[in-house]
Amino acid sequence: MNHTKFQTSRIHRMLLPLTCTLLPAAAAQAAEAPGQKNAAGDRPNVLIIHCDQLGAWALGCYGGTQIETPNIDHLAAEGVVMTNFYANTPVSTPSRGCFLSGLYPNEHGAFKNDKQIRQDIPTFASELRDAGYTTGYFGKWHLDGNPKRPGWDIRGKDMGWSDRTSMYSFGHYKTIEAQPGTHPKFEKSVAASAENYPTDWFTDRAIAFIEEHKDERFCAMLSIPDPHGPYQVRPPYDTMYPPRQVELPATLTEEPRNDHFFYNETRNKIDRRSGKSEYDLILRNIRRDKSAYLGEIKCIDDNVGRIISYLKQAGLYDRTIIVFTADHGDMMGEHARMAKAVPLEASARIPFIVRYPKLIPAGSHSEHVASCIDFYPTILELTGTRQHGQVSGHSLARVLEGRSDRWDDAAFLRCYASVYPWVGIVTPEYKLIYGEKDPNGKALLIDRRKDPGELYNCFDDPAYSRVIRELTERIVRYCREHNDPHGEWLEKRIR
């Protein structure tokens, strides 16, 4: 498919009636337009909306209050929200590899940014394609290793995606060249319009793909490269949330009751003792970045509304499994940190929303702990697709459908990409993280029920000695079973 600038304008004109207003909750209840009979029969279509660096904390359906996200929240109200869903590694490449392959980072090969995913493993997309689905990917890929420059040229295998003409290798653009086959221009200035801003542009590509294949079984993955930095967004979103009105997190200046690396690494930078001018500058920068970050999310939400409107108009809304998620979050000032790569909630906990009324009860919430590796087997079971690949994740289908409450309730997290490698476990009650360079051998233990702000390190508290021992054994067992190299230094440490 040859996407030209002319075609981009035409698609926007075609979709203009769908973009004039937000999708209110009342409109979302409207009946679907009668569509043509789906030649694929009863098996559902699949649409995955996958964002980059979108923390669960920002969305209304996850308790966020700083922006309104009515369209994403509407998907949540009509489906199920996983409140404890985690990135196995809160960094782009390894997390995307986990989501695609159902394997841990050291198993799928892309264990840090700029590492290519193994080319010999199946993916949920290849399984669906083999089962008769037409598959298409639109947006940022970031699983192709370290090409010399960003662009539309993907070197590796298609990994199950038949249409990847609008898949680009890596990077974050604010203006997209509407001509795959050339290298898109990287513009940091906010000169983009709704016709060439990435969130809008890739949404157009996904809608066009679905329109072309609406009488087939399809799986479309819309990989939106926002709200990742550079924190800039097109008008009118760039002025919706003035920096002076942006709320700063309480943990930004509140002193943690511990001395762990994850807090102390940047704490001195935000300490008033460092000088008022520097302190004020840091706060201004955080407000500026968060202002744009919230605008980027609002733009995403509006585009989710466009997709919902199109699916309803095409008679596909109730015949499509819709998944909304992200690769990792963004600290955005929490604990005086920005970006990701740490196991704290703002970085590691991500949204995971699934809507499919035929199987999933509306308005459901699940507090079970799960992670990206669980998506592969889950989507195959939900679509009735036989699984051939060997994965480390487990299917959440019965949990999402409300048919079973049995679940292991643990997520294993690890990170190799940062200057501070770490590995750990999250359960409903606790989070235990070991870092290779922990000061004085002191790990991080959070009592999640008592301390949702993650301000207290309970590792030295004798009352938690049994918890620490049991969770440590589980981490060691995970490392052994999955050949995670973090286990080498961890076992030496705890001997």
Could you say what each language-model-derived stretch is?
Residues 2, 6, 15-443, 452-480, ...:
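Formylglycine-dependent sulfatase
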